[in-house]
Amino acid sequence: HSYAMQIASRNMSALAKRDYDNTGLGALNWLTRLVTNIEQDESAYQNLINELQAIHRGLLLAPKQFLLVCEEHQSEHLVEEVQEVWNKLAVDRSPVLLTEVEPEVSQNDQAWLIQANVQFCASAYPAVEVAHADAAPLMVLAGYLRNGFLHSAIREKGGAYGGGASYDGNACAFRFYSYRDPRLAETFADFEASINWLLNTEQKPHQLEEAILGLVSSMDKPGSPAGEAITACYALLHGRTPAFRRTLRARLLNVTLEDLKRVTQAYLVEQKPVK
């Protein structure tokens, strides 16, 4: 189902497109074409090697930062070791020329045929990145729809192994999904039905509280010392400062049912999904 969600949201952000091309089913097609080209044309293999070498040199020329996680008394020695290795590295500093690839942008639905008696369904709507004020309501909305409607409709009644909704701030997408699902069209109808359920039936405050607490607890979940350091480093590199996290946490705690209905109308009703 991760592949299905990736396909549906493939063109909703630059990162989503990159992930689809590099790690998704799109990459599988690329690898198939590459192998075929190499088998039919000897120069194709050398062209691949040349391209990989150019990418490697481009990485070596790029600005670098090193993250070192260790015990305090070892830090000075290990920093010296890292510096010694990189200072001795000889790098060709001539300009790096890489093949430019024209992006293929399409919002068409896709279906991939597999040898199985079950389906993996996904439906994606364009959304906002995580710093946007609507990101918090969309995060809560995903859990709210999953707990309040989708789990029952898709798993308990529909017979799928699982299903739900998720908001992805990197892909800038709000996605519905199911996995190992004996149904197809009926599941997509359930995705739509969850929207109608939220907008047109009475909602209970305790369900909202459960969705919010689930998100906040996942944010506050402790990790290992090394894991915490690594996470903090990459978060800072991408502007996810402690102040940013506090702001997001406060926004999550302040989400109301009216907020859920507002973002549902704006992002799910007034936009067409990609399936």
Go through each PLM region and give its residues.
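M16 family metallopeptidases and their MPP-like homologs
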Residues: 1-43, 61-71, 119-140, 150-255, ...
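Glycine-rich phosphate/diphosphate-binding loops that line cofactor/substrate pockets in enzymes
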Residues: 54-61
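An aromatic/glycine/proline-enriched structural segment found at the starts
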Residues: 65-122, 127-129
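Well-ordered, non-membrane alpha-helical segments in soluble/globular domains
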Residues: 45-49, 76-79
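Glycine-rich, charged/polar anion/phosphate-binding loops
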Residues: 50-53, 105-110, 126, 160-162, ...
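A short, acidic, amphipathic alpha-helical segment used as a generic capping/interface helix at domain edges
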Residues: 47-53, 255-267
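Aromatic-residue-lined binding/catalytic grooves and analogous aromatic/hydrophobic interfacial grooves
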Residues: 41-46, 55
